[in-house]
Amino acid sequence: MALVSLPWMSPTLPSIQLATLASALRQEGIESDVHELYVDYGARIGLNLYNLLGNLLGYLPEWVFSRHYYGPEQGDDLAAMLEQRPFGDDFPWPELADSVLAALEPVTEEYLDDLVRQTDWSRYDVVGFSLTISQLGASMAVARRLKRAFPALRVVFGGSQCAGPMGSTILRICPYVDAVVHIEGELVLADLVRRFRDRRPLRGLAGVSHRTSGGEVVTEPAAELVMGGSRKLDLDYDAYFHRLLRLGLADKMNPWLPFESSRGCWYGQKVQCTFCGLHDIMEFRAWDADAVLAQLERLQERYGVARFYSMDLILPREYLRTLLPRIAERGHDWMFFYEVKANMRRSELETLAAAGIRWVQPGIESLDADLLALMRKGVKPHQNILLLKWCHELGIYCGWNLLYGLPGESQASYTRMAELIPKLAHLQPPSGGGRFQLHRFSPYFEHPEAHGIQWQGAHRMYRYAFPIAKEDLDQLVYLHDFTLDPALGEPVGTAAVEAAVQGWRRANRSGATLALTELSGGQGVILDHRDVEKAPTRHPLNQAETTLYRYLDVGVAEKLLAERFQRDHRACFDALGGESGMAALVARWLADDLVIRIDGKILALAVHANRMAPRRQPPPADAAAASEPVLVDRAAVMT
């Protein structure tokens, strides 16, 4: 069997999807070859341009390849897409956009021809395509070429882009696909291959769509089949590294090794965020910590790479007590990416840092309590700020988004955020964001009326990538158009927040600082250089003032502040002049924006210089399909 992955996966990651399936097939006695052909396309058009295109909304990456399906299949080269100016504001140099898209057409055609010619596909009886990130157009184009060249070949699609009704729709619109797997592929792929080889019908094979002898598309019920947490799979990335060497890319990028330690989301299983459509299977399962550690050690030893990219939707909570301390105890000098929930304690973040987790995506999404409640995030704004502050101290890079345009939001939320953001200039700004999108499987999508959303169908631009009936297009894609119920009122203005975010990014790039340094004798000084266009301001603190400021590090309920500080630090409380003196000091700090009033608490904003970790270079922006923007070299794009 051949296992294939096409653009637009990140070239800096081997395909864990193919490696997982190959391992499962080996355990069933079925041989397979892995073909990570997205790397070839990145090498052909240049990694900078590849990353730029791959991070755009899905309709344009899909169109780059779908025109090579519908052109020869239906005589439609999908040129109408060009009239829509599909790059929008996302292309760095608009004057080059048309030239780049025009140049891609013959290059992509040549890539597809070479792909079929350079591999002996006659060696295989089944080809499986993994579809995850805007890979449908490319997979359809290649499936057509292979099926026409080798009519006896069986073609299977699977992956998250085939979940739910999307999979059966693929069968309806593409006659070159024989079966589509909707569920986790390890559960059924071996049985599916055996049935193909034995010429047995696919009827009753759970979670698989297929055609009857009469051509009708049938989807077998999944029966809640999910992978358990006791599996044992050995990931093999040999094919990827051989490909890098063959293409001359081994010295041009720093790969990350993807791994998986859980599936599902322990928070989403209880309360799914309203906008989140990451997957249709939220049931949470974590793998055995010892098995994960053994796999990481084997991968590092075999490939000499110590950068690990977790594919988990969320870090398993139990790993704070098991996997991460064990990594630290063994002294591994590793670097990790993980997705986490934002309401972590500092001690938990210290555990992450000690294990080498230097890049997190915490799902902050907003800094306003009302907006976070609308999203059902389960966190408060002060917890998001604490995470940013502590990650800054611990040398953990945060990639996070700021979302706008939620149904039911108010202008007051954005007024509050616009006032708050300049006070946070010393912390990590959002790396992405914008108006929320309507994704399949999200609560907003599943129950639009309950949230004041009027569903309009598939995103309008997809019709230029897939010229099919609207009812099929609505079932095929992940991104959808919508309007908001007029009863929700006029759209709120976000210009002030967007301008504040731009200022935040500029200040952060210029080294904005707000830091408390503790001196001998218990005294301290706060250096405030958040406004990088002005000279920094020094705020000397005596011992009692330093103690109070440190006390506010995690935030203290304002109503209980005097009572608790007197209880815990009686001598300092008296030195400050009791409750009235302490209140006057806090008022001065509030006026200077050294502390803020948030969620009913008084929260200190300065990071602690005495506990800052050594600064490390942030992870590369092209490491994976994350929220981080891609830096593009103009000369490389033109070349």
State each model region's role.
Residues 4, 20-22, 35-69, 73, ...:
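C-terminal accessory regions of radical SAM enzymes
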Residues 229-394, 406:
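Radical SAM [4Fe-4S] cluster-binding motif and immediate context
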Residues 572-588:
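Short amphipathic alpha-helical interaction segments
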Residues 1-4, 27, 300-301, 306-310, ...:
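Conserved C-terminal portion of the radical SAM core fold
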Residues 587-601:
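A short, conserved structural fragment
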Residues 8-41, 93, 100-222:
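Glycine-rich beta-alpha loop elements in corrinoid/cobalamin-binding modules
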Residues 529-569:
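Short amphipathic alpha-helical interface segments
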Residues 600-639:
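Short, amphipathic alpha-helical interaction segments positioned at domain boundaries
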